[in-house]
């Protein structure tokens, strides 16, 4: 135990002593590193690495020596007998090692001082060399400048010498010419002297000339000296100007260099600003495109919501006022006046006009005129229905409406002698719940067709100027030329689900043989703008020149289902169930209480699309116009033909129901004159894809079954942008109650007609 602890202490002491040497060398290295110049970094790094390796080698040698001595001490301890001798020897060894280490320390300190002196000498030498290099560099630059100046001076002197040489050559040439002239003059004078006589006068003249010549020569000599002086002055000015020119050229070069740098900097700034402007313009275009899309989508959704609210409110008010005959106020964009009780028959007309006004007008297209004719047909049929309801059964007489080819309708009462009625007993004078059922079925078709119709015109944006095709899943599509096809495509779909107790359209219900059907003609209706201008001769005018004209019984679809309003249908004779749109839920009302069908004991009010106009005594008093007789021959012959044609067309429409929309009956002013009966006419039309099977069955008995159709409309507006596609969906559910009736007995119909008459 003692031996083991002793060995541990010895090893620890030796290890700490071995570590003292590198630790003592660290401050010296740091001092050297701080004192060294920056350009000695590489040399110092190399020296530090070499010193580190040397110190590590020395430490390893010392550790090896310590371990060797410890091993020898342990071996000697094993040989000794007592611990005192071992301790004494060990202490002696430690003292000897301490003396050796002290000597080694003094030696290392001496070597460190010598190395420090050598380093100081080397640093001083290096600094001296650096100073010498700087001096030599400055001297070299100065000598280069002097050499450049000497070269420039030499060049200037050479140029000046060249100019002077040219001037000297020119002066020599000029002097040679003058000398030749003088010699020529002298020779001429000599010849003259030789040839002329030696007279005193001539001699005196020659002397005078000689004097003059000498004077002229002296003057020329003075001029020559003056010219030389001027040449010297000009040369001095030329040297000055050359020096100024050189200075200016140098200044120009310096300015060019400076301005080139500035221009480059400005060009870089301009490029940077141009890139930023382009990026800002792109972001602005994206933002403006998104804003336009959002505005279009917002306006479309707001228009749809307002349209549905207006449809629900106006149709609920109109239908309720149509039965109780009270004035109402229409909250529409185009009709805001309050109607009087006399004009109660115009409610359904105004409803159809509001629905038509909600659609975008396709001006300039060939489909516009048939759509207007269709709306006029609906309006006039509704006017006839409401006028018949207001007059009541006691004011009615057998009468027919004869539509001439010129567009004028004449109402002629039936003459018993000249024109007997079409059916004996006049069963058309006996309205019952079937007429009301027919009217409500017409409203139901209008509602479904309006739901399938196109949207209201969206606010035009600058970006969209091309035509847009709004596809309606089903029978057709509407064309709206106001928008672009790739901007905000609007899609609509209609899903129709029928109840369990619905009567299939191919059941045994047949139309009554006593209701003639006008011929089917497309595009023959008068335009909607001229509806109030048509008059009937002999008929009671309603309001100011607005005749109640009856139109076709079926609805024509152009490129898609026509529009309709009237989500809210009020029932008489039973309490309403639910307040959603004033419509009943699935499950059905009890028999005899559906869609405003009145009981048999109540006074009948006739509502149909093919009602005859009849003239009563009250209207005769008000209008003050005498009745006119019926054309009997035309009426009797055309009743049978139209019944046959109608039944054939009904069969064709049943077969083609799944392929396209039903045609519209719109007799115009050029159509043949046809008599109209008071009972409704059943037309099975529409497409099965849209669920628009609206077959109004005629029956005098209460309805046996009630059919419910649930029309679910989903309209989606897709917004296309550069990053993503966002879809907005709006869903409206309309539950519509339709009354199906079975075939009644002809005998029972005749009895009821005679009793009602």
From Swiss-Prot:
Which region ranges are annotated with the description Coil 1B? 84-183
Instruction: Mention one GO molecular function.
Output: structural constituent of eye lens
Q: How does the record say this protein sits in the membrane?
A: Peripheral membrane protein
Q: Where is this region: Head?
A: 1-39
Q: Give the positions of the site Cleavage (by CASP2, CASP3, and CASP7).
A: 432-433
Spell out which residues are annotated as carrying N-acetylalanine: 41
- Residue ranges of the region described as Disordered: 406-436, 493-705
- Sites where Phosphoserine occurs are at 5, 340, 419, 512, 701, 754-755
Q: Which tissues is this protein detected in according to the database?
A: Abundantly expressed in both the inner and outer cortex of the retina, expressed at a lower level in the nucleus of the retina (at protein level). Detected in eye lens fiber cells (at protein level).
Residues flagged as site, Cleavage: 40-41
Family of this protein: Belongs to the intermediate filament family.
Annotated function:
Required for the correct formation of lens intermediate filaments as part of a complex composed of BFSP1, BFSP2 and CRYAA. Involved in altering the calcium regulation of MIP water permeability.
Return the PANTHER family for the record: FILENSIN
Protein name, please?
Filensin
What is the native source organism of this protein? Answer: Bos taurus (Bovine)
